From Swiss-Prot:
Protein name as it appears in the record: Beta-defensin 119
Family: Belongs to the beta-defensin family.
GO cellular component labels: extracellular region
Keyword terms, alphabetized: Antibiotic, Antimicrobial, Defensin, Disulfide bond, Secreted, Signal
Matches recorded under Pfam families: Defensin_big (PF14862)
Main location as per UniProt: secreted
Amino acid sequence: MKLLYLFLAILLAIEEPVISGKRHILRCMGNSGICRASCKKNEQPYLYCRNYQSCCLQSYMRISISGKEEDTDWSYEKQWPRLP
């Protein structure tokens, strides 16, 4: 019986449960990017994630440095064609 309690105590002491299958995907840049060790060929690395991996964004993503929408030639309406 003591062995059972010892086993349960060790099992509960484990920080992360063991999960089979896919690993949890760590998102970055407001869920626009994915943290990876190396970016895919259609992605661009931008800054770093908490785990010191690159934050990979799709090549078409635009990042606003000022934090607000600017009315410039790079605005969303002027960048993409309108769909009928």
